[in-house]
């Protein structure tokens, strides 16, 4: 005899008619057999098969044997849960219909069933405010996904939501053929990196720069954010905006931009104490740079000092220097943007300047300026349009040449400046006494008397009254080994080497956030 039981917990159909003692007739409805399987009988007491039946707000499916299905696919489009009810407006992680009979390890995928119970396929769909993508079989997509030329990131296998904003991601695996070539390139991409996805989920790529939250960032053609030194970042093609180190020794300083460390990445502005560029072969030095819109302030190739050749610098490169105003103060930079300190010859002004250990240009008197393992006193102009320039000639009773105070070693020394001759003591004090006898160390002549016009020598006598030729052996002023500063000086040693300038980077009050200089 068939056992009749009401499906109460899930089903809400009308109650079955009370079972008559003779059981000669039955009303349509649900019944559970001795095995606990539900069936549905129509008004003719026929078992319903291959058909959906609705009970209250829920739909249930009877298979070809009339058994109500549970936790199963129906026609590869619908899914019924453990209670047998059709899934609607909900997610389900399960095997595909075709894999049900031959399950594979980790073969489950997420499916979404809409308001009519059908799985979502081959489309994007907004669900609870988030956008998801599905393949032709209805499986939710995850990870990297390419749709035409657009690239998205859809979270991990249990997420799937279309991402927006910044994400630190691994580049796609080789099997990700849909996006391989768009989001991955072993030549110019790191194994991991920052990517930015717009509000529409599309990855930023194929652009030299992009403004995000008020700051500029650079991306290569594969969408990976570029950081630190960028070679070719100024061009419009993202494919040319490469990470540093791809063109070692062949890059021009004009090619280079700086965009902060990988944790930040935005285009640099202000002062930075950083390692140099590998492409420019300055990566072995840590120097101060000043950036404006990512470009370093630097000397141009017109700022050539005229000092060249293997005797000038260790690598034989030409020396370039420029005095550049930064935030109201003057600093010195070379052609690669490295800030310079100490005594520097600036070709554009054809003069020497001094920049202290923090890079600031100094004016006035500077004592103990190192030169050839010795120290000298310099004086730099403070006004009259020559701010900072080393002075020439007499100043307060002392003789200067390009800022350097000219001195005797022990006694008195004659210097020739232009076509004029001067006599100074070991402190650099100009002499003008016509009665005093001087020991001249230029040629070790003793007891010489001079006549002067102002401080300029106009005549001289030796102790025996004979004329002394003060023009025969005067000292020529020099800084290091430099006696003049025209472009003809290609064989003398550079004063840059001889005065033992050591570039040192000191704390400027620079902060990680602003790169400011105090």
Regions found by a protein language model. Give the residues of each.
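Extracellular adhesion/carbohydrate-binding repeat motifs centered on closely spaced tryptophans
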Residues: 2-495, 499-502, 506-508, 512-518
């Amino acid at each position: 005899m068939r056992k009749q039981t009401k499906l109460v917990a899930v089903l809400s159909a009308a109650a079955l008619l009370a079972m008559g003692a003779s059981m000669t007739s039955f009303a349509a409805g649900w019944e559970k057999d001795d095995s606990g399987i539900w069936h549905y009988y129509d008004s003719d007491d026929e078992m319903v098969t291959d058909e959906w039946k609705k009970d209250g707000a829920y739909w249930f499916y009877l298979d070809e044997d009339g058994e109500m299905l549970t936790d199963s696919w129906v026609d590869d489009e619908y899914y019924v849960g453990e209670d047998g009810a059709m899934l609607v407006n909900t997610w389900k992680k399960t095997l595909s219909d075709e894999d049900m009979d031959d399950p594979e390890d980790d073969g489950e995928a997420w499916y979404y069933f809409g308001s009519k119970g059908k799985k979502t396929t081959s489309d994007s769909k907004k669900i609870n405010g988030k956008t998801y993508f599905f393949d032709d079989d209805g499986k939710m997509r995850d990870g990297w996904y390419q749709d035409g030329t657009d690239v998205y990131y859809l979270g991990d296998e249990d997420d799937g939501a279309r991402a927006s904003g910044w994400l630190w991601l691994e580049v796609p695996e080789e099997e990700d053929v849909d996006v391989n070539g768009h989001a991955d390139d072993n030549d110019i991409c790191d194994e991991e990196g920052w990517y930015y996805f717009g509000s529409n989920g599309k990855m930023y790529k194929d652009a030299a720069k992009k403004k995000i939250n008020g700051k500029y960032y650079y991306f290569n053609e594969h969408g990976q954010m570029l950081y630190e030194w960028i070679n070719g970042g100024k061009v419009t093609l993202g494919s040319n905006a490469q990470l540093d180190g791809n063109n070692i020794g062949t890059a021009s300083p004009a090619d280079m931009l700086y965009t902060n460390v990988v944790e930040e990445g935005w285009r640099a502005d202000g002062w930075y104490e950083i390692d140099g560029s590998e492409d420019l072969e300055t990566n072995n030095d840590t120097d101060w740079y000043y950036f404006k819109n990512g470009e370093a302030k630097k000397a141009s190739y017109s700022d050539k000092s005229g000092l060249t050749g293997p005797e000038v610098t260790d690598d034989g490169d030409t020396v370039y220097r420029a005095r550049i105003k930064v935030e109201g103060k003057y600093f010195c930079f070379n052609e690669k943007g490295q800030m310079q300190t100490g005594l520097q010859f600036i070709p554009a002004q054809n003069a020497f300047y001094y920049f202290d250990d923090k890079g600031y240009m100094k004016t006035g008197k500077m004592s103990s300026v190192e030169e050839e393992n010795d120290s000298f006193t310099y004086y730099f102009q403070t006004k009259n349009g020559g701010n900072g320039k080393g002075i020439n000639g007499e100043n307060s009773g002392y003789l200067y040449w390009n800022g350097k105070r000219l001195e005797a070693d022990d006694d008195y020394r004659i210097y020739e400046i232009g076509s004029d001759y001067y006599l100074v003591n070991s402190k650099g004090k100009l002499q003008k006494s016509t009665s005093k006898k001087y020991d001249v160390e230029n040629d070790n002549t003793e007891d010489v008397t001079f006549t002067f016009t102002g401080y300029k020598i106009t005549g001289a006598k030796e102790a025996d009254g004979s004329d002394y030729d003060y023009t025969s052996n005067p000292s020529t002023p020099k800084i290091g080994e430099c006696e003049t500063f025209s472009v003809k000086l290609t064989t003398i040693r550079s004063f840059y080497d001889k005065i033992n300038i050591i570039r040192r980077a000191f704390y400027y009050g620079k902060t990680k956030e602003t790169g400011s200089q105090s």
